[in-house]
Design a protein with these regions (language model features):
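Enzyme catalytic cores with a strong preference for nitrogen-chemistry domains
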Residues: 1-356, 368, 372-381, 413
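ATP/NTP-dependent adenylation/nucleotidyl-transfer catalytic domains that generate, transfer
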Residues: 169-171, 228, 237-240, 254, ...
């Protein structure tokens, strides 16, 4: 279980009602197939050894004995599999019949887990045959059964108990059965609080119109509420269709996200690679996730390498892949940004808002947000003072785009050529114009901030910052230059998302505005602080610090889920295969780790700005890190990859 990943599987076998021998052969076949693909936890549907739709046959001695014989066969045939297998059967204990899950490992039944909530409404008549787990004395009893060798063994019948792997302590799971999920207080809630990172549900949920969507949402939302993985195996083909139809709707969800789903009315296996470290990190982070005491059964599994074949990592984790969802998200984000800014403008009684408009992505987004905020407040857009400040690195393309944007949005444009002021400043401090050092670059950035701040004072306004989350993570901002403003609207927006927000605005506008926004998107990302070559941008940010799609990927998994460098590298290797080789990924990952630590001092004094997503670097909110923290541990791991 390297890096906390474990493969789990839900299987729907072909069944014959009451034909335990046939059912067992199908279950064993699928169990072996899943184990061969690396699954460590394999679950089957409710009452799968007999079939769920046996009716009054559940009261027949022959069927009950056949179910136990079938369980012994499962134990014997799967004894060599490096996996835990969970199957369903009817089990008689002290004259009462329980609908149970049998947890099987290394040829033994670790325990039986009985169903708690026995439905007896609509099409369900389970109380005709089964009793609830609530009838157990103290929530636990035991039952003597014959094992595969013909020996009598005592197996516990338990509730409020989880199962934990000795070799992989994060591999913990609890079991509930079908209806248990559909009630106001499912057993899985307590099981998760006891420490179960995976909830297994053996189900026989019949299909009616609209139920699949409800079921899907139920599983997904329960996994999110419990910060767990939810493994749901549903009965399917072969169950009696006398009155009902079963679709074999298998589902695997993790922390609110659906990872795998079977095709309706099909048989077979679905898989997912679950990130147990991520789940543990989320529970640790959320101090409101309460823990309670419960029973624990341990089991042993030989650790096996996981190739992550059934795990995907979004290439742009901050940006939804689905266009409809992406557009919806973009609209929501722009509204959040604009509302935050509008509230601040109203509170400060600012008459104007000043923004440095370079013609690049970040300042364009800041202008878009400003326009939305002014429209919200029903203010004249002429109160927006867009300032272009050409200097040594400015190109005609970016300056022209800035001018076109100001005109298209109907805001006030002011041009302040800062070359003379910067020349004088360089003379004052003895800086040669031929020395293209950090002083040459930062002198321009700080001069621009000086101009903006003084214009804001002069016009009774406030400076709106343009820097984005990716730049803050890398420290790609001049301290007390573009780093500083009176309100930063982009501080929670990573560069990959900035691009999509501007593209969204371009898609919903017409004419010249759409054209100029598209040209902004096509312009290389650059601070334009070094002289151009042949009139073209010579200083390209991604050539210097690396591709933003990589840095945003690193940033997301480091901050959101606490991934270590080796785990980030592994995820990036899988995600960017064919795009970047391992050497390139390692190079920029090392750069990211180094810069992230050394540049914290800039983030420790950020201006106010709205939180937009779950990953942000505000020192007053989500990220509180000392400016003098040492990166040695992270760099050592990154450099050793």
């Amino acid at each position: 279980m390297r890096d906390g990943f474990i493969k789990i599987a839900a299987a729907t076998p072909d069944l014959h009602v009451a034909d335990c021998a046939y059912n067992t052969s199908e279950i064993v076949k699928l169990a072996k197939e899943a184990a061969a693909k690396g699954a460590k936890l394999i679950t089957f549907p409710e009452l799968c050894l007999t079939g769920y739709t046996c009716g009054d046959l559940f009261l027949q001695e022959t069927l009950l004995e056949g179910a136990l014989d079938a369980l012994n066969t499962v134990c014997r045939e799967t004894a060599e599999l490096a996996a835990v297998i969970v199957v369903g059967l009817p089990l008689r204990v002290r004259g009462k019949l329980y609908n149970v899950a049998a947890v099987v490992n290394a040829g033994d039944v670790l325990a039986f887990v009985p169903k708690t909530h026995i439905p007896n409404y609509s099409e369900f008549y389970e109380q005709r045959h089964f009793v609830s787990a609530d009838t157990l004395s103290g929530g636990m009893e035991s039952v003597d059964i014959k094992n595969a060798d013909g020996e009598t063994v005592c197996v516990p019948l338990v509730t409020d108990t989880i199962f934990q792997c000795d070799e992989q302590p994060l591999f913990t799971f609890g079991v509930e059965i079908c209806e248990d999920l559909w009630v106001p207080n499912p057993p899985s809630t307590a099981l998760a609080q006891m420490g179960a990172h995976i909830i297994v549900n053996l189900s026989a949920s019949d299909e009616i119109i609209g139920k699949a969507g409800y079921r899907r949402d139920l599983v997904r939302q329960q996994s999110g509420r419990l910060l767990c993985a939810y493994l749901y195996a549903d009965a399917g083909f072969g169950e009696s269709t006398q009155d009902l139809v079963f679709a074999g709707h298998d589902l695997i969800a993790e922390n609110g996200a659906l990872l795998a789903e079977s095709k309706m009315f099909s048989q077979g296996i679905i898989y997912a690679d679950i990130d147990l470290q991520r789940l543990a990190h989320e529970r640790q982070r959320m101090n409101t996730f309460e823990s309670i005491e419960g029973g624990v059964f341990s089991f042993s599994l030989e650790p096996v390498e996981n190739d992550l074949a059934d795990r995907t990592f979004p290439r742009t984790p901050f940006v939804p892949a689905n266009k409809a969802l992406r557009d919806e998200r973009c609209e929501e984000i722009l509204t959040l940004q604009a509302t935050g800014l509008a509230t601040r403008l109203r509170h400060t009684h600012a008459k104007t808002a000043v923004v440095g408009l370079s013609g690049g992505l970040d300042s364009t987004l800041a202008l878009i947000v400003l326009v939305h905020a002014f429209d919200m407040l029903e203010l004249d857009r002429k109160g927006i003072l867009a300032v272009t400040m050409p200097c040594f690195g400015t190109t005609a393309r970016t300056k022209g785009n800035a001018e076109k944007l100001a005109e298209a949005y109907g805001v006030t444009l002011k041009t302040v050529d800062i070359k003379a002021a910067v020349d004088q400043h360089f003379m004052d401090i003895g800086q040669s114009k031929d020395d293209l050092s950090v002083t040459f670059e930062n002198g321009q950035a700080r001069m621009r901030t000086l101009v903006l701040m003084n214009l804001a004072n002069k016009n009774g306004g406030m400076v709106v910052g343009t820097g984005d989350l990716s730049e803050l993570a890398l420290g790609w901002a001049t301290y007390n230059g573009d780093h500083m403003s009176m309100y930063g609207v982009n501080g929670s927006i990573p560069k990959t998302l900035v691009r999509y927000l501007v593209a969204y605005e371009a898609d919903r506008t017409l004419g010249e505005l759409s054209d100029v926004l598209q040209d902004v998107l096509d312009t290389p990302v650059s601070p334009e602080l070094l002289p151009p070559k042949d009139g073209e941008i010579s200083q390209k940010t991604e050539d210097l610090v690396g591709p933003y799609e990589l840095h945003d990927f690193f940033l997301y998994y480091m901050l959101r889920f606490g991934y270590a460098p080796r785990k980030i590298f592994r995820a990036a290797h899988k995600t960017f295969a064919g795009v970047y080789d391992d050497a390139t990924i390692k190079k920029w990952l090392t750069t990211f780790m180094r810069r992230f630590f050394t540049q914290q001092f800039k983030r420790s004094c950020l201006p106010d700005g709205p939180k937009v997503g779950t990953v942000t670097l505000s020192p007053r909110g989500d990220w509180r890190m000392p400016s003098d923290a040492v990166s040695a541990l992270w760099l050592k791991e990154a450099e050793s990859l």
